[in-house]
């Protein structure tokens, strides 16, 4: 689908941070290529929200926090399965910073997530325990923003969880494919697209070329 944002739309820019781009600790293939697309898209939107992965050192989701475990293994934690990741987006480190070429001066809000040591957080709306809200849903409703355009990294984790939670919260959701990249762990990109279709999450292309 093609699109033209209106006053009730918001651009949700997910985790465009150094550690998720080439050269970072948890790079998404071609993650840096979303930046110029997102910059151009953002100029179409009056309302923009950013998310930022913001982990303390020793976070439960880090493989290094579990003796004998390797990145991309899964373990069981209090709220269910947890994929273990390389250390990434540690608070105050260069890897946690937004990409320097991300140019969205009118972004109104930054949602930091994953800062609780024992709960991971993929979604912009809820921690992975599925009970702890970030406050984003209320922020959007208070401003009459009813349709979310989701972009960023990684398509099959933080973008996916954010889009799904937004849909379940009653928002209309569009994922802009060419402004996302996936990491694809065990077929997770395919599963993401199937989930979007089942939940009524639309997809679009910015097609800025």
Give, region by region, the residue ranges found by the protein language model.
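Short, hydrophobic/glycine-enriched beta-strand segments
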Residues: 9-16, 20
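Active-site flanking residues adjacent to catalytic metal/cofactor-binding acidic residues
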Residues: 14, 52, 177
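Short, flexible loop segments at boundaries between secondary-structure elements
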Residues: 174-189
């Amino acid at each position: 689908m093609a699109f033209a944002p209106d006053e009730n739309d918001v651009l949700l820019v997910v985790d465009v941070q150094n550690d998720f781009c080439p050269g970072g600790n948890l790079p998404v293939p071609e993650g840096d290529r979303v930046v110029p697309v997102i910059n151009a898209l953002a100029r179409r939107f009056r309302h923009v929200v950013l998310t930022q992965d913001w982990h303390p050192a020793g976070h439960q989701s880090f493989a290094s926090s579990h003796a004998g475990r390797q990145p991309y293994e899964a373990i069981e934690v209090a709220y269910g399965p947890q994929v273990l990741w390389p250390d990434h987006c540690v608070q105050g480190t260069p890897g946690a910073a937004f990409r320097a070429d991300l140019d969205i001066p009118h972004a109104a809000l930054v949602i930091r997530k994953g800062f609780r040591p024992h709960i991971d957080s993929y979604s912009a709306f809820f921690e992975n325990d599925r009970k702890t809200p970030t406050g984003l849903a209320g922020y959007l409703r208070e401003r009459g923003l009813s349709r979310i355009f989701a972009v960023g990294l990684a398509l099959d984790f933080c973008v996916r969880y954010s889009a799904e939670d937004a849909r379940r919260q009653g928002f209309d959701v569009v994922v802009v494919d060419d402004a996302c990249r996936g990491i694809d762990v065990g077929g997770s990109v395919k599963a993401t697209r199937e989930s979007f279709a089942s939940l009524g999450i639309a997809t679009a292309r910015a097609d800025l070329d």
